[in-house]
């Protein structure tokens, strides 16, 4: 293969040093001219096994599909929780298996899942990864490896969140806003392992989103195709870019708050719990 490429390069060089003189029909070697060379299709590597395509894949489209499927799964869980809440409100005699603590926990997890783990992941993670490179003319995100890591951080965050349903005491029931210090006080539903797993999940989610958000912003600002100014960008890309900037300003504060509340819970610090 290497010898064939070498022979082709030699032939292109020979062609570039010769050109036919239109007036005399003779070869004029003094004119520096390169004939347009036909370039064959380039074979790009595409993984075919499940692990190569869905685990270690750095293709923005595949990552967008991964975000979409994971977000839809969390959305289905949130939908089931909303059914249980409405069942308790509409037919309390039929929902005897639900206590007041269960209702608080379902409201908390439904709100957190829908606002953070479903909408953000679906519209920014899913549609953002799939549409941004297509609409700005980029081959891929500027940092494909970081893009892959951002999804798996989100996936682990969802796994930790779902694990909180199966710990003693169940998930947190402090409300989806998680106001401190009520969230970690004894007597609040899920104030044990439930709130701890929620805080860990939020921290992982924000770290993963930060990696993905920086990727979006740099791709939009630096990897647009030639001629596409910011004023010529599609409104869809503008919407994703604006939402990403707003989230990048808000989520770091959420991360710090989650870490401080975790330290209050585990190490008995006094960021929110002044009695310690």
Where are each of the predicted segments found?
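Membrane-embedded and interfacial regions of multi-pass energy-transducing membrane proteins
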Residues: 4-6, 12-276
């Amino acid at each position: 293969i290497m010898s064939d490429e070498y022979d082709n390069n030699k032939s292109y060089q020979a062609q570039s040093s010769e050109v036919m003189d239109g007036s005399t029909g003779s070869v004029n070697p003094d004119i520096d001219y390169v004939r347009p060379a036909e370039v064959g299709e380039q074979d790009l590597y595409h993984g075919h096994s499940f692990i190569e395509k869905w685990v270690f894949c750095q293709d923005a489209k595949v990552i967008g599909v991964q975000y979409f499927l994971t977000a839809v799964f969390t959305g289905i869980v949130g939908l089931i929780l909303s059914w249980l809440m409405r069942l308790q409100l509409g037919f309390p005699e039929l929902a005897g298996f639900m206590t007041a603590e269960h209702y608080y926990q379902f409201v908390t997890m439904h709100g957190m899942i829908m606002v953070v783990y479903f909408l953000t992941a679906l519209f920014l993670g899913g549609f953002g990864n799939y549409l941004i490179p297509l609409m700005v003319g980029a081959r891929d995100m500027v940092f494909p490896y970081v893009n892959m890591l951002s999804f798996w951080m989100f996936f682990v965050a969802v796994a930790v969140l779902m694990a909180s349903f199966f710990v003693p005491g169940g998930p947190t029931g402090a409300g989806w806003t998680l106001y401190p210090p009520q969230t970690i006080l004894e007597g609040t539903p899920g104030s044990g392992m439930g709130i701890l797993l929620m805080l860990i999940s939020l921290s992982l989610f924000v770290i993963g989103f930060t990696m993905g958000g920086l990727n979006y912003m740099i791709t939009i600002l630096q990897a647009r195709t030639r001629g596409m100014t910011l004023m010529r960008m599609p409104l869809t890309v503008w919407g994703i870019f604006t939402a990403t900037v707003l989230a990048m300003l808000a989520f770091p504060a959420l991360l710090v708050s989650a870490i401080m509340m975790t330290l209050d819970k585990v190490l008995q610090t006094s960021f929110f719990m002044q009695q310690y």
